[in-house]
């Protein structure tokens, strides 16, 4: 137990590995999957696909270990960790994705996941209320997964609007976190703005070039798993990605590593989790990602509600 205690006290190395593996599995596995089917010449395509698979497994086992280390703070994380372990063996069941086991398991994950996110908010500061739109976005993804896979009925809503509202809350939370006027905070804001600039130029290029607009509509929504019911909303998606990159970089530079990495995990998996390619990790990851966003908070809302609660 002392080993786990030491690991919990020094979570940063795991967050670094988790951040790197989640980024590269997204780039080489999720994001690479769709451009690779287009009539484009991709050099060393086989190597890139292999790298994607390697980083996917590194990501899986790192997020599994991270969830184990979060159990001390979030008691419901025990059930999410157990669900991750069970998901390893689910494919051993013939036609598991069409079995009552699969449907029951998805409903179970949804109920526990929403409860865990509520626990995460209650065990963090008052500023975490700004993350409620992000919690709502993850909850919608979980409910959308049940609606599609269990009841075979797609949940129609403006996912891009949910994403943008989530971003508004997350950026506000990032700016308010550690309000000390330090050089590090100013550097974080400056670098975040610099990261946003290329996306602004991309928005202009895509908006003024119909061919690029069509190409981006073929790639970006499929990469993220998000449904754009209006193809002209592709520029809004580019804006959302730019603001996401800005907020994540700001969080990491300001020292809130878990929030930056957690939000990246949320946005890169929350919409994929609706269908998830029948891979449960894409349904579970946003839940763990949200818990990571609030992990560094010391003051707790639950202590304000009930001061005796420890």
Curated annotation (Swiss-Prot):
Gene Ontology CC annotations of this record: plasma membrane
Membrane topology note: Multi-pass membrane protein
Annotated compartments: Cell membrane
Entry's transmembrane regions: 51-71, 76-96, 98-118, 126-146, 156-176, 187-207, 233-253, 264-284
InterPro entries reported for this sequence: Cyt_b558/566_suB
Key words of the record: Cell membrane, Electron transport, Membrane, Transmembrane, Transmembrane helix, Transport
Top-level taxon of the source organism: Archaea
Protein name stated in the entry: Cytochrome b558/566 subunit B
Source organism: Sulfolobus acidocaldarius (strain ATCC 33909 / DSM 639 / JCM 8929 / NBRC 15157 / NCIMB 11770)
